[in-house]
Every structure is written in C-alpha cells, then in structure tokens.
Amino acid sequence: MLEVLKRINTLAQKEREQGLTSEEQALRVDLRQEYLRTIREQFNKTLMGVTIYDPTGEDVTPEKLKEEQQKYFD
C-alpha cells in the first residue's frame, strides 16, 4: 500500500508542476481506487473485531454489527 501511496503522491506533484498525460490521469484514478479499496478493507477488518461494552461490562454491541461479524467469521 505504501508504494501505491508514493506513486499517487508522485503523480500529484507532477500534475502541479507540469500536468499529466491522459494515461497518467487514468493511472492516478486506478491507483486511488486501489488505495481506497485497501483502506476500506482494513477498516472493515478492524470493525469486525470490535465489541462494545457499557460501564457495567455488558456487551452492548449493536445487533447489526454482531450479524455482520457472524457472517464475516463464518
């Protein structure tokens, strides 16, 4: 993922300095989509491991999240 981000930043800098060709613009779009897909996957993995407890120690994780976690781990 770091290489994708570096390439995105390189293209952004080049765009500011001299502009991008249509091929580079298409590459930038693809790289951004790949980066966002990776971020979303990481977020979902993190969320699937979350359990929410109230101050008394009871599990108050929303049912919808519990259902999604069940699907994820099955």
Swiss-Prot record:
What the entry lists under Gene3D superfamilies is as follows:
Helix hairpin bin (1.10.287.540)
Keyword Cytoplasm recorded:
yes
The UniProt keywords, alphabetically, are: Cytoplasm
What SUPFAM superfamilies has UniProt attached to this entry?
Answer: YnzC-like
Give the family this protein belongs to, as stated in its UniProt record.
Answer: Belongs to the UPF0291 family.
GO cellular-component terms in the record?
Answer: cytoplasm
| Organism, scientific name | Enterococcus faecalis (strain ATCC 700802 / V583)
The identity of this protein, by name, is UPF0291 protein EF_0064
Pfam families listed in its UniProt record: DUF896 (PF05979)
Location comes to: Cytoplasm
Where in this protein does the record put region Disordered? 53-74
Return the Basic and acidic residues bias intervals: 61-74
